[in-house]
Amino acid sequence: MRIAHRELGSGGISTNSWTYSAGGESAFLAFNPDDPRYVLGGSYQGTIEVLDYKASAGTNVMAAPIQYLGMDAKDMKYRFNWNAPIIWSKHEPNTYYHGSQHLLKTTDMGKTWKEVSPDLTRNEKEKQGKGGGPYTNEAVGAENYGTLSYVIESPSEKGVIWTGSDDGLVYVTRDNATTWQNVT
């Protein structure tokens, strides 16, 4: 859901003020705050909905357009968290980052993606079975372990990006993803 602004003379914000936004039921959203025409919203399996508010239309994009249904996480090209992080870069025009076990980068609204990091998780294969397993196997490929759960770009220093994984690692790059340092 989104709201453009508080409506003057309306007595406040009501349920009529809200409109649909991109992504699934719980997801990261990313957009350029100076031009919020496009909103990128995440969903499970690394799917991102790109919503164009001017055209009132959207499309789904993926770094690897593969259906991971029923696959073990260790066999997936990219392991995405249910709420995989997506951020807009304030330092690089038209650039968005998306976290799997790698940090992925797009400069064309998700048509193409480039890996800009090595695996930034512990990559423990014995913990990369069916999603949600062994106790609540959901077989959708959405509940994976060994994924990035947070990505943040420095608001003041170009080229500085931090990541956090669900298996406890924190990495930083200070040279625009050329090298990464484990600072856990």
Q: For the regions a protein language model found, what residue spans apply to each?
A:
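Beta-propeller blade termini and top-face loops
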Residues: 1-184
